[in-house]
Amino acid sequence: MASPEDENPFQDDPGQEDEDGSILSPRGLEAFSRKVTTTASHLMGPVVDPSSSGHYQSAMTEVQKHLRRPNLQRSMFSMARTTPSDLVRSKLSTREIQHRALAHVPDDMLANIPEDDNNSYSLFQGFQASFPELTDEGKKHRRRVSRGRKLLDEGPTTPENGTTGLQKLRKERASMSHELEMLGIRKNMASSEIREIDIKIANLHGMRRIILERLAALEQEETLLEHDLMEVEARVEDAQMLADEAESTAQQSSPRDTDDADAEDNDGFMSQSIYEKIPSAASTPSKSRKPRIVRRKSMAVLHEHFEPGTSIRELRAHQDCITAMDFDAPFGTLVSAAMDDSVKVWDLNAGRCIGSLEGHTASVRALQVEDNILATGSRDATVRLWDLSKAHYDPHGSHYNGGDDDDDAMAFENPDDQPVDPPAGSMADCPLFTLSSHMDEVTALHFKGDTLVSGSSDKTIRQWDLVKGRCVQTLDVMWAAAQASVSLGTGDGAWRQTARSQAEDADFVGAVQVFDAALACGTADGMVRLWDLRSGQVHRNLVGHTGPVTALQFDNMHLVTGSHDRSIRIWDLRTGSIFDAFAYDHPVTSMMFDARRIVSAAGEDVVKVYDKVESRQWDCGAGIKAAEEMKNPPAIVERVRIRDGYMVEGRRDGIVGIWTC
């Protein structure tokens, strides 16, 4: 049973109560101090070092001194009849007391830190040296061999710690050996993965090669089927025309029979001689058929899957220098002309010659093929039109050898590397008509739709109507240059006689291109003139080249020109200024561009290619392979054409090379 003293230890006399309950007696304070000291010793004793328990006792003694102050007594024990033990338990838990005791470091403990005059490293530096992998520098160099070494030198070796240091070194050696072994295992695993990837890549290359062969076979079959379809369409067209003629003849015969009956009744209407002069329907010639424009229904995509600069085929086309060539589409129809006065038509898909075009009396200097319609301009001052769809050509078999066909071999392959003569008469039905109004050789031509323009050494440019087959306009270049000089008063449009790179054999009109009513022509004075065919006047003069212009081509924004001054210039058609320019080591003899590349023949055994997307120059042609294999260099490239990354180049020795670009 609790004594009266235990019931209220804060009173000096249990039977009496002080008038002011907030004032504590000395006896009560001593009892409270003992309880707080006992509680603190009980809670904090197990988690601290016994040697430091005196700190808490001295702390409680200091608390007792402060608690004796009257003001502090009033503020702390203002609540009536609340024991100190209940007050402490309601404010601080065991976990909170332990945390405060561990986290708070009093000043007297900090003052007792021993100082080592012989050690110049701080505690933090020692931590960094012991655990270098936790620092920023250690993280950057974690894979180095020295990552496990200490950054601080160990103290002097004594007999007591010598054994411990040796054990640490052995453990470190074992750890490093294990790590080295693991690195070797990982390296072997990485090598195995690389070998597996190489095997997969080789398998993928093999699969790609097989699929490319399948694609080539599909395109070959597609071309043959398309050729058969065009033949059937031509037969349907002919049958329909014959049916229409028969129907019109039948309709005309009925009224003629009636007229003959009436004439028998009226013998005096006309004499017999008059009737004999009336042409009959059978003798009336039918209207001439227009050239049938045949467009391909499919486009080849095989060349798009080859690496740029890959050689597709080489053709021994001619025995002399190639002067002009053009093709309509990738793996389509190629027409080539040379100094040997021959013009040949080639099937690029099979690599065989379809036939030769005969009619010109001199070599062809310019030509263009579009939708099976071919225009050729020759030194004989004539322009001839041809319909290549009328050629007698069977793409299924060989016309040259009578043996069994080998489907896997390249058709019409010549083992002696000599041009093979095509069958006679295969192109006999191709000529359409001849345009002969020029007085000198035709050096440039271009047609679009029903309009054809041709430039000649007679210093004129003529516009032709392909429907009527006649010349509709003649443009005098010298007269236009004189008119421009007079009207401008600056001499910018005048004929320039002192071009620095003027060549004696340069063509007066080097290149032309027409689109609707717009005409661009490049001449021997280095000028590029833009004409308006509706008025026959020069709309703008582009001055920049110092040599004869040999090639030009324009789209809706830019015009690209090549010249004997060894440069290619890109002009902005909106402002008439130079947008870009490239310089080469030799004169530019031929140039063409597609959506991505500008290709040019610049007096070398390779074709100069400029990639407009990547803005880089590179070479493509047989000269690269010959240089790598230390062989004799091939002939100089004279002509080059490109469409959709499919490039054809013609050389001085008559060989035609076909490349992906």
Curated annotation (Swiss-Prot):
UniProt GO BP: DNA-templated transcription elongation; DNA-templated transcription initiation; mitochondrial fission; mitochondrial genome maintenance; mRNA catabolic process; regulation of DNA-templated transcription
Cellular location(s): Mitochondrion outer membrane
WD repeats: 317-358, 359-396, 437-476, 478-498, 499-541, 544-583, 585-620, 622-660
Entry keyword set: Coiled coil, Membrane, Mitochondrion, Mitochondrion outer membrane, Repeat, WD repeat
Coiled coil: 211-254
Protein topology in the membrane: Peripheral membrane protein
Gene Ontology annotations for the cellular component aspect, listed alphabetically: CCR4-NOT complex; CCR4-NOT core complex; mitochondrial outer membrane; mitochondrion
Region of interest: Disordered: 1-29, 135-170, 244-267, 275-294, 397-416
Gene Ontology MF annotations: GTPase binding
Biased composition, class Low complexity, residue ranges: 154-165
SUPFAM superfamilies noted in UniProt: WD40 repeat-like (SSF50978)
Function: Involved in mitochondrial fission. Acts as an adapter protein required to form mitochondrial fission complexes. Formation of these complexes is required to promote constriction and fission of the mitochondrial compartment at a late step in mitochondrial division.
Family, as annotated: Belongs to the WD repeat MDV1/CAF4 family.
Name the record gives this protein: Mitochondrial division protein 1
Name of the gene: MDV1
